[in-house]
Amino acid sequence: MNFKYSILFICFVKVLDNCYAADDLTTLRNGTLDRGITPDCTFNEKDIELHVYSRDKRNGIILKKEILKNYDLFQKSQISHQIAILIHGFLSTGNNENFDAMAKALIEIDNFLVISVDWKKGACNAFASTNDVLGYSQAVGNTRHVGKYVADFTKLLVEQYKVPMSNIRLIGHSLGAHTSGFAGKEVQRLKLGKYKEIIGLDPAGPSFLTNKCPNRLCETDAEYVQAIHTSAILGVYYNVGSVDFYVNYGKSQPGCSEPSCSHTKAVKYLTECIKRECCLIGTPWKSYFSTPKPISQCKRDTCVCVGLNAQSYPAKGSFYVPVDKDAPYCHNEGIKL
């Protein structure tokens, strides 16, 4: 997997950046990479599975949107849980190891109902092929369709199970971050309001580097948008949220020798923040050419802790986050906000 990511994003990044999250996949299927060698990553809503985690289903169960009532929680007329909807990225799955760990942290610490959207075929993970990385442009195009699926599922939660939008947050990694943004746009179009929060974990860079708000994750897609940047090669290196955390300057991460490792670290960092064993502190950082404010000078009104409580801090903008190599990754000099 790491080798494939490196090949895709280092060797083909310039080609892929000509693609975009199109409404019409015909453009992408007729693209320069489609010459009979690309996998068929065509999106079909029927292929999507929902991995549902709760305290009585800690290992998760697999459901389809059409058969939710097979799980007793969805036999109720109202769901009162806080809900986290997880959306994976390219070549991944809804129950990948890192998402599974995050889901279990969410149900253990905060009793969330966690729903991980598995769109693996549309993300080109359903194939045992050496050229599946060439399906990236199709996966990019599929993000809008998956976003609409998530929005439609949200409508079901709101209207059938009386879940307020203020109880729903989306957490997306890589392409899943932009998918979350498209879902956020769609629920507003459906006049459902805004999600409480979207957390974009190293939002994908290739094919999104020059995109404006309508075609990527944007700070207007939820009441609060938090972005955690960990790879300048695989992720976007510009602000997309209410707060943008640049971990280790957002370039590469301690202990990582490959871009895919840094890209994935965003998921691991958030999981540790959910566990609340420590606070990864973001200190104001205006630009790459400026010096971040020292952590020792941090106060609650100027700095922000990464994670589910970030919205409780008043500061917004760009933040530098120092981290250690090993979990729980704290490098906060004993400062508490």
Curated annotation (Swiss-Prot):
Residues 22-35 form a propeptide. The active site is at S174, D202, H263. Gene3D superfamilies: alpha/beta hydrolase. PROSITE patterns: LIPASE_SER. Keywords: Allergen, Cytolysis, Disulfide bond, Hemolysis, Hydrolase, Lipid degradation, Lipid metabolism, Secreted, Signal. The keyword Ribosomal protein does not apply. GO terms for molecular function: phospholipase A1 activity. Its main location: secreted. Residues 1-21 form the signal peptide. PANTHER family: LIPASE (PTHR11610), LIPASE DOMAIN-CONTAINING PROTEIN-RELATED (PTHR11610:SF173). Belongs to the AB hydrolase superfamily. Lipase family. This is Phospholipase A1 1.
